[in-house]
Amino acid sequence: MKRTYQPSRVKRNRKFGFRARMKTKGGRLILSRRRAKGRIKLTVSDEKKKY
């Protein structure tokens, strides 16, 4: 049986990346909440670039 999580960096960044979050009002709310909480990584885009 094929597993459900088939990682792809491109898909991950397009769906959960910083620019994707900035596109919608809800996404901007997520970012503002994470800033208020003091998160070091706001989005998955903030992880170390390996590619």
Curated annotation (Swiss-Prot):
A GO cellular-component term linked to this record: ribosome
InterPro entries: Ribosomal_bL34, Ribosomal_bL34_CS
UniProt keyword Acetylation, yes or no: no
Keywords, ordered alphabetically: Ribonucleoprotein, Ribosomal protein
NCBIfam families from the UniProt entry: rpmH_bact
Any one GO molecular-function label of the UniProt entry: structural constituent of ribosome
PANTHER family named among the record's database cross-references: LARGE RIBOSOMAL SUBUNIT PROTEIN BL34M, MITOCHONDRIAL RIBOSOMAL PROTEIN 34 FAMILY MEMBER
Protein name stated in the entry: Large ribosomal subunit protein bL34
Domain of life: Bacteria
Family statement: Belongs to the bacterial ribosomal protein bL34 family.
GO biological processes: translation
